[in-house]
């Protein structure tokens, strides 16, 4: 086996990057152990949405009460029905006595202040859910789309599982405390990502800072919308049991981070801690496109082939999340049998891109033959064998 440094890689990484590499579905993601940050949140999960790289996590798979962050799923269910045409923003729904009693002002929870018996446009209800965090608005929609709020919550759970939220169970549409109403920080981050990618046309509601309904003006409880860090969503949550939580997304250039925190003691903590974690994620990391899909990494010698060389290409785009202080530790090589015997079919896996970082297992990316190489005929093979014997040539 021969270990070769790819010529394209050497020129691109002349400064000997120590990189954090993400693979999706075969690009890798890893962070060197030296990178560390602490948080006062009980649960936290921070990812780069473009690469999927996990930048930080704390108890990310620990079951937790999501409180009003549950409403992201309620809104997602509405978005799906708007997309398939079964609902329109102009549709109206009647406020039931149940929705008023369970979600209105007397309930003690966040509310849109809906009046029983009144018909309300869906777009107003949607803003009531997202901007005002109205429990009454959630219940009105749940009762309209299912036989009851409980039945709607069952549909929410089923759909959440289909989206990949494997550790999430909804018992209501609002996030009202229930011992079985649980999720994880990682699941909420996935839901946020799906919301942003699946429903770009509706995502703007999460960035709205206020909404006035029935002459009552309420501001969005997301404190990061009022800070200069380009946050454009998503949802806060708070109960006595879960304390203060937030699912947030922010952009910086062509990067987007998603952060989930929960179990913060005060509103002030919910304002400061997410801002600190997001700033860290943008400041200490960057994304780097190493190879495009189908790009040639290097070439290899061919034995007994009609061509002397075969290009080695990477099948899919390789996008890196680089930790700025994780440089000067990474080694990148390409390994393959040298020379590679013909015949070679285009697309055959014939080499490996090997990435090593101190303290981590070796990570390997397959490289494919970028062209077909036919085997020489009998006389050609004899001539090649003779040259190899007499002069040591292997072409």
What are these regions (language model features)?
Residues 16-30:
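Bacterial N-terminal signal peptides
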Residues 1, 22, 99-103:
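Short regulatory "switch" loops immediately downstream of catalytic or recognition motifs
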Residues 34-186, 193-197, 211-214:
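Active-site-adjacent loops and short helices of periplasmic peptidoglycan-processing enzymes
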Residues 25, 46, 94-95, 207, ...:
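Hydrophobic/anchoring residues in structured secondary elements
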Residues 1-14:
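N-terminal secretory signal peptides that target proteins for export/translocation
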Residues 165-169, 177-395:
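Domain-terminus/edge residues, biased toward the C-terminal soluble/receptor-binding domains
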